[in-house]
């Protein structure tokens, strides 16, 4: 058993804060329109250049175990903000560091950490309510483009393309991002569908950075029942291996031995495969699988028609240009279905909508209609070099997520202004004791930090700008760090999604509260010996089965 290193009290927190400082200092330089890039060495290929806070945070691991514990906690704030709202990762990092630093000082001075936390929670809840009150719904293409532009670090073209994509497929439509084969940046609408089922095992993931399974030009097997044994499927699996193309299995469920066998062969490289549960329930599930079959020019393998798995061949499988599977969703892009058959299916669903008297059935039929006829907008990102394309693609993905957040909860004045002005509402909060009041003061001071950092990255004095803005009662009055002018942020189009600002603050406060209420830290003691290289396993398989292991 590994021996443990145990640290207590302020010494433990101070070392954790050193790790937090290291990570925050690397991330904070990316904040605002004049934020800088960060170059990250990769284990293979060219270095990665990014201005995305969460990408920088994810790349950092510290040798010192205690400092690393602090850095990992701070990283979790950035990661959570990215997962929930798609942006605000650097803001969350800056806020968490400020809250944790000030909180630790007060704990060291004898304040009760639990009361400090209660005061911070009161303040954060009040600011969240203020953000919700201040938010303004966005409707126009211009406003959508503005959000996309700001979230992509001032790239107008990205903002305009996202607005165009949303116009093509609707604000709730499916939009994906992929690398183009040329220099251009285009929006293309293709046949496609998204449904709310993710991969059945994380071992199917092909892109570990984004935790998604990406299948290029896959075959798609649609099976109505549960799969618990792969024996009947051996002929079709062998045919897929021979074709050297990936396979997506959509079934009622894939369980037990069948799932384990697929995972083993995926890991050993014999079979590029992923499995997901079919969407819907009961009769609706069968109808949705038939929709997918028509979209991909495949067949639903169903015992009602006397079809058996052992008799399935390549011709019965559907195909698509690309399938992307996340933990929650599956997106089928550019299925090879016949246009006439898809149109006939759409007309059939429309007639069912007209005939049904149930509001619930009507809603579900309309969902199916939207999935089948809406299509998928693909943002194709090009560039001169691979490094440039990847960096721009990251920004497009962030901007798309932030734009969706803006459509969902509205927008507020950007550039750190909303948090700064919201801090002024906290002076009226009533608390039970001075320690809780101190917790509120921590939040008031920390809310100034994102704006200070934006201004500092633009080469000006953040404290001076904050002082000048606080003299004004107008909550939209702020500092345009791009043009170095004081403006009405909403009129100038400098806006942030309310969800992004809210999530950044809540995630930062959550992490900071954990740090200031931590009294003991237990980590693995560093080993003097170098760890031996792991043994590499051989490639398992059975003769005549193309390296597959069944």
Swiss-Prot record:
Main location per the UniProt record: cytoplasm
Compartments where located: Cytoplasm
Keywords from the named record: ATP-binding, Chaperone, Cytoplasm, Isomerase, Nucleotide-binding
Annotated EC: 5.6.1.7
Top EC group: isomerase
GO molecular function: ATP binding; ATP-dependent protein folding chaperone; isomerase activity; unfolded protein binding
GO biological-process terms attached to the record: protein refolding
Xref: PROSITE patterns: CHAPERONINS_CPN60
Presence of keyword S-adenosyl-L-methionine: no
UniProt GO cellular component terms: cytoplasm
SUPFAM superfamilies linked to this entry: GroEL apical domain-like (SSF52029), GroEL equatorial domain-like (SSF48592), GroEL-intermediate domain like (SSF54849)
Alphabetized InterPro entries for the sequence: Chaperonin_Cpn60_CS, Cpn60/GroEL, Cpn60/GroEL/TCP-1, GroEL-like_apical_dom_sf, GROEL-like_equatorial_sf, TCP-1-like_intermed_sf
Binding locations of ATP: 30-33, 51, 87-91, 415, 496
Catalytic function, reaction form: ATP + H2O + a folded polypeptide = ADP + phosphate + an unfolded polypeptide
Record has ATP-binding as a keyword: yes
Family: Belongs to the chaperonin (HSP60) family.
Job description of the protein: Together with its co-chaperonin GroES, plays an essential role in assisting protein folding. The GroEL-GroES system forms a nano-cage that allows encapsulation of the non-native substrate proteins and provides a physical environment optimized to promote and accelerate protein folding.
Record note on quaternary structure: Forms a cylinder of 14 subunits composed of two heptameric rings stacked back-to-back. Interacts with the co-chaperonin GroES.
Protein name per Swiss-Prot or TrEMBL: Chaperonin GroEL
Organism: Rickettsia prowazekii (strain Madrid E)
Gene: groEL
